[in-house]
Amino acid sequence: MKKKIGLLVMAYGTPYKEEDIERYYTHIRRGRKPSPEMLEDLTERYRAIGGISPLATITLEQAKKLEKRLNEVQDEVEYHMYLGLKHIEPFIEDAVKDMHNDGIQDAIALVLAPHYSTFSVKSYVGRAQEEAEKLGNLTIHGIDSWYKEPKFIQYWVDAVKGIYNGMSDAEREKAVLIVSAHSLPEKIIAMGDPYPDQLNETADYIARGAEVANYAVGWQSAGNTPDPWIGPDVQDLTRELNEKHGYTSFVYAPVGFVAEHLEVLYDNDFECKVVTDEIGAKYYRPEMPNASDAFIDCLTDVVLKKKESVL
């Protein structure tokens, strides 16, 4: 009989319906309810992208496809997928409890975020391992980062090339690629967090692979807190690049995310487009990885490499 291995797929989570928005943001704010104005603003953002984010559906599809693919490409072990979310059910701890109840003793934990940071990957894996230790007889093997995975870089190289191939030579000369990820509080840099360096590296790999000469790194979706967040913000960067270099076509690659959701559909497709419209420039944004076969193949390699190194 094949050994069963847990596949703990972790992600941020998103409201399933409009009524979930308040409790979801209360959880993000560690139990403090958002003010009525804040709640209205958030609800309006969701309405602007069609009422609710497609993220919940995409995350589940990514996780199910990954489980299926892992069990197709090898015959040594049987992977059982459990979904654990940071801010809404099924919570990370619930997924770990389910694994324990199913008699799983080893699990590979994959966070659907390519770059490591203490705020994201470390906190997800930490929560899972803490719960597993409480329950006993279950070891969680966490994957730190996978931004260097060749198939991940290739996904974005192909996506970016697809946009540039549709441009004339003249447009290409005046085009710039903005590679971005979710901003985090600046204090992580002083703590030696590798997150900003990993994004810079990712941008270099993609620009080199796609043969894009003009590119810059930006940050987006910063939180509304008194602490300074990592910049430059993608909107400010857009204006600055237009003013300084006269770029008139902007290609946004939000590589810190793996799916279409509020941060991409609103912060990029709406907010950044407002800026490009303002300055009379063109807006482009390649398709996100979502549950595409190319991306599922990438994640499959990531999990298999981890399994080989620990089990």
From Swiss-Prot:
One Pfam family from the record: Ferrochelatase
Coiled coil: none
Family, per entry: Belongs to the ferrochelatase family.
Organism in which the protein naturally occurs: Bacillus cereus (strain ATCC 14579 / DSM 31 / CCUG 7414 / JCM 2152 / NBRC 15305 / NCIMB 9373 / NCTC 2599 / NRRL B-3711)
Record-linked PROSITE patterns: FERROCHELATASE
Sites where the protein binds Fe-coproporphyrin III: Y12, R29, R45, Y46, S53, Y124
Protein role: Involved in coproporphyrin-dependent heme b biosynthesis. Catalyzes the insertion of ferrous iron into coproporphyrin III to form Fe-coproporphyrin III.
Subcellular location, record wording: Cytoplasm
GO function terms (MF aspect): ferrochelatase activity; metal ion binding
Keyword Membrane: no
Catalytic activity: Fe-coproporphyrin III + 2 H(+) = coproporphyrin III + Fe(2+)
Gene3D superfamilies reported for this sequence: 3.40.50.1400
Binding site for Fe(2+): H182, E263
The protein's annotated pathway: Porphyrin-containing compound metabolism; protoheme biosynthesis
UniProt enzyme class: lyase
GO biological process entries: heme biosynthetic process
Domain of life: Bacteria
Name of the molecule in the record: Coproporphyrin III ferrochelatase 1
Keyword Transport included in the entry's annotation: no
